[in-house]
């Protein structure tokens, strides 16, 4: 069984691109370019890709909702009074120990929302698994992930345009954490990665 590691090349890529000295890209171009780079990485295969060689055409190019900057919102981390271990269920039925860091409080589409942020052993960034009203229809039924780089201020940007599928979506050999009930959002999040079906339009 292979574990889906929480460190995400995708979020790191956005940070790296924003730090270069070339003329600044537009928000849409930056996200689109990172999506293209993820396709290239997965297509190369090897340890960088969860996709089996025989399944490349089934999953690539990855499918996304259209980029919508209104899904990128500020959030305030309310730290947990005591950091406790949470036994997070996984796609294989086992439990994985993660640390509950606190609650991200934000507003989206006029609705006040919150998501619990976790820390996985060996990682410094925040891990935010979530599901929403598109889960199981337009997006993967087991939810999606967002990774956040730590900040000194406790202010974060939750960008659902970079929400991505767990590796077990592509390959059942991977063991993936499942979003807890507290991270089920009662609205549709039509941003980020979605399922690629025969009749879906591939959007980058």
Language model segments and positions:
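Bacterial N-terminal signal peptides that target proteins for export
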Residues: 1-10
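C-terminal motif of bacterial Sec signal peptides marking the signal peptidase cleavage site
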Residues: 17-19
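Bacterial signal peptide processing site
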Residues: 21-23
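N-terminal secretory signal peptides
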Residues: 30, 35-103
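Mid-length scaffold segments of soluble, non-membrane domains
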Residues: 79-142
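Acidic, glycine-rich flexible loop segments
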Residues: 131-164
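Beta-strand/loop-rich accessory regions of lumenal/periplasmic or secreted enzymes
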Residues: 160-169, 175
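Acidic/polar low-complexity flexible segments
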Residues: 175-202
